Amino acid sequence: MAEVLRPEMLDISNDTSSLASPKLLHVLAVDDSMVDRKFIERLLRVSSCKVTVVDSATRALQYLGLDGENNSSVGFEDLKINLIMTDYSMPGMTGYELLKKIKESSAFREIPVVIMSSENILPRIDRCLEEGAEDFLLKPVKLADVKRLRDSLMKAEERAFKNIMHKRELEANDIYSQLKRAKI
């Protein structure tokens, strides 16, 4: 008599190491002002975030490997960015232009991008939000802003994790049903 297979006996991978841990978010902070960079870095670290800081949009693209050259500082598989926070007004390339390049990238378009600026210019804010910015924060950024962003991202990561685990459970049950019908 054949042994009946149950879902827990199936070799369905439960390895979730490739999924982002909702405990420590990795933020890429982009600002040409050293004072603002240090300030946002401090706020993010106090909020339990891993932080990588760069001083320009060009350096951010290099870090992400989106500069068209193969000189990224890290390998793609090691690069898990949960959020990009960028100043709007920077020499060379604005935060808006960086946002557009990120949203054009198939590898990074899903990463939320937050634009920061000391200038409260409504058409600029609207343009950034229409282009796909997650939020637009006025400087100086407050700890409450960072905590709100972090909490929102952690909830989104948790929902994504639960959705993946639910999908895997449904797949296992489907395989189990198929095997049961086939009487294997």
From Swiss-Prot:
Taxonomic lineage of the native organism: Eukaryota, Viridiplantae, Streptophyta, Embryophyta, Tracheophyta
Protein name per its UniProtKB record: Two-component response regulator ARR5
Main location: nucleus
A Pfam family that the UniProt record links to this protein: Response_reg
Native source species: Arabidopsis thaliana
InterPro entries per record: ARR-like, CheY-like_superfamily, Sig_transdc_resp-reg_receiver
Modified residues (4-aspartylphosphate): 87
General function of this protein: Functions as a response regulator involved in His-to-Asp phosphorelay signal transduction system. Phosphorylation of the Asp residue in the receiver domain activates the ability of the protein to promote the transcription of target genes. Type-A response regulators seem to act as negative regulators of the cytokinin signaling.
Any one annotated GO CC term: nucleus
Gene: ARR5
UniProt tissue specificity: Predominantly expressed in roots and shoot apical meristems.
GO molecular function: phosphorelay response regulator activity
PANTHER family assigned: TWO-COMPONENT RESPONSE REGULATOR, TWO-COMPONENT RESPONSE REGULATOR ARR5
Family of the protein in this entry: Belongs to the ARR family. Type-A subfamily.
Any one GO biological process: cytokinin-activated signaling pathway
PTM note: Two-component system major event consists of a His-to-Asp phosphorelay between a sensor histidine kinase (HK) and a response regulator (RR). In plants, the His-to-Asp phosphorelay involves an additional intermediate named Histidine-containing phosphotransfer protein (HPt). This multistep phosphorelay consists of a His-Asp-His-Asp sequential transfer of a phosphate group between first a His and an Asp of the HK protein, followed by the transfer to a conserved His of the HPt protein and finally the transfer to an Asp in the receiver domain of the RR protein.
Protein localization: Nucleus
PROSITE patterns given in the database record: RESPONSE_REGULATORY
Induction statement: By low temperature, dehydration, cytokinins (BA and zeatin), nitrate and high salinity.
Alphabetical UniProt keywords: Cytokinin signaling pathway, Nucleus, Phosphoprotein, Transcription, Transcription regulation, Two-component regulatory system
Domain Response regulatory: 26-154
